[in-house]
Amino acid sequence: MYRKFSDECFGPSTLINAIKVIALVVLITISAVVYLSVC
């Protein structure tokens, strides 16, 4: 039971969610830099 809980907490799904958040932040940062460069 404890092991299953650990796998759910630190499993692939958590890693994928973290990657999605990081990708979103990077995308917003790049968009902001491009916007400032153009203006």
Swiss-Prot record:
Residue spans crossing the bilayer: 18-38
Presence of keyword Transmembrane: yes
UniProt KW keywords: Membrane, Transmembrane, Transmembrane helix
Compartments where located: Membrane
Cellular component GO terms held in the UniProt record: membrane
Superkingdom per UniProt: Viruses
Membrane topology, from the record: Single-pass membrane protein
Induction comment: Expressed in the intermediate phase of the viral replicative cycle.
Protein name: Uncharacterized protein gp20
Native organism: Escherichia phage Mu (Bacteriophage Mu)
